[in-house]
Amino acid sequence: EGIYMTTATDPYGEWSKPVNIRPGAGWIDPCPFWDEDGKAYLVAGVAKSRIGYKSVLHMVEMQPDGMGLIGEEKIIFDGNLNDQITIEGPKMYKRNGWYYIFAPAGGVKTGWQTVLRSKNVFGPYEYKVVMRQGDSPVNGPHQGAWVDTVTGQDWFIHFQDVYAAGRITHLQPMSWENDWPVIGVKKDGNDYGEPV
């Protein structure tokens, strides 16, 4: 059990033997992040079924080559202390001096998209719900990522759970207001977007 790292010079070629960089159960949805100064970090959620608790995000510094961790793991966000229950699936970015972690919360079928931000990689992080189902038929917008194109457009790709049909992929327009992302379209004066 743990988080493993493997490398290859060609994605179709031979992969190295996996190295367990974080032994033990519990961490899920790991996301590596390389900062402008060359330092690297690993952020991840946790699964209650494997570790006994949920709704927190952990972070630890990582060797720049990804082959090991440096220092102690830290809880950087605890969704149990606010309304971000079941926060998971973090994706980390940096923009305009802000560290951002995009993470869904509330569960796959009825959840929402939350974004955390901080000027310090280890926080403290403030958060904002940036997309909810609202009046859209797209339930629980979940497990997404920011896509910034070479032409300067921003998009958000995520899935929707549609029971027997599986997980349907959606692409939402994304823009920025006051250094917070706006995903989808805002309606009725809401502070969050809805899927289009």
Language model: regions and residue ranges:
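Carbohydrate-active catalytic/glycan-binding domains of CAZyme proteins
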Residues: 1-196
